[in-house]
Amino acid sequence: MGAPNDTVIFLRRGKIERREDAFRIGKSKYSAVRTTGIIIAGGAQITTQAVRLALRNEVPIVYLGGNRILGVTVPFSERYATLRLKQYEIASQPSARLAFARPLIASSILARAAVLEFLANETGITGLEDAADEVRSEAERALNAGSTDALRGYEGRAACRYFRALAEVLPDWAFSGRRTRRPPRDPFNAAISFGYAGVLLPVLLSRTVAAGLEPFLGFLHGPRGRRPGLILDLMEEWRALAVDVPVLRRFLDGSLSREMFRWKGDAVLLRDLDAVSAPVLTVLSRVRGGLLEAVDRRIREVRDGVSRQSPPEPLEFDPEDVGVVWDALEV
């Protein structure tokens, strides 16, 4: 958990109580007007009085059980009924869903290319710039994809090249060069899997629901079971900067060491969840200019696009953006 000025409270142990117009955790106080989200995980608790304070200040609360989202508490409001109707309309039209999915996937590809370009400059490792160019070339194809399957193909090729390039940067024991999940088969995969599902997803969920959007109606990720399709779509743009970069930095500076992982058959498990959640929350809350502010701005752009039935433009990322995140993690 971060310092009292963090905009997101992520609590795994302890209790959140109300103290006047602030949330109190032990001896620390968090101003309700400065708090933009609360995530309750593990054995953490929150009092009814604190929940009421959150509702009055429109602070969404997400409850986690393991990496699974159990529920969300948000203020009762009629403001977004029309917006939801328009979102349902888009979700019912494959061509409209594709139009909204294209810029999100293109953005995610551009973010990965920017990470590789930054690492090329930072490390001097041969081949990273070429890898960045190869990844970036898939963004234009994604923007012009003629079908959902084609879009997934461009994203998949970009992701494969990106992760293969990251293997040149990370220690051999940490990463195999392939993205694996269910189960993750190496420490880097274990760390980013938790960063995506255990930190970034609930943060985005709280902010998306607060913005009035239906989290289960995605564009690329359609409704399926308990999967929040729209949140998975929105995550695509922020995985690289909000999770991959801080996890990379912590592997390279030794803060994430072999001892923090446990091998169990084919799976690798992260022992110290705070070793990943802390740097991810750091870059979300404390990056100069506000990465979390950029996330909120993007959610508003998507919301406005849904309201107008017009998809947003893709986000642009460059190595300087990655450098700001990297520098925020200086030990």
Curated annotation (Swiss-Prot):
Reported cofactor(s): Mg(2+); Mn(2+)
Q: What is this protein called?
A: CRISPR-associated endonuclease Cas1
Protein origin, superkingdom: Archaea
Keywords of the record, alphabetical order, are: Antiviral defense, DNA-binding, Endonuclease, Hydrolase, Magnesium, Manganese, Metal-binding, Nuclease
Give one Pfam family.
Cas_Cas1
Q: How does it assemble?
A: Homodimer, forms a heterotetramer with a Cas2 homodimer.
Q: Which GO terms describe its molecular function?
A: DNA binding; endonuclease activity; metal ion binding
Task: Explain the purpose of this protein.
Answer: CRISPR (clustered regularly interspaced short palindromic repeat), is an adaptive immune system that provides protection against mobile genetic elements (viruses, transposable elements and conjugative plasmids). CRISPR clusters contain spacers, sequences complementary to antecedent mobile elements, and target invading nucleic acids. CRISPR clusters are transcribed and processed into CRISPR RNA (crRNA). Acts as a dsDNA endonuclease. Involved in the integration of spacer DNA into the CRISPR cassette.
Q: Where does Mn(2+) bind?
A: 155, 221, 236
Q: Which family does it belong to?
A: Belongs to the CRISPR-associated endonuclease Cas1 family.
Q: Name one GO biological process term.
A: defense response to virus
Q: State which Enzyme Commission number(s) the record gives.
A: 3.1.-.-
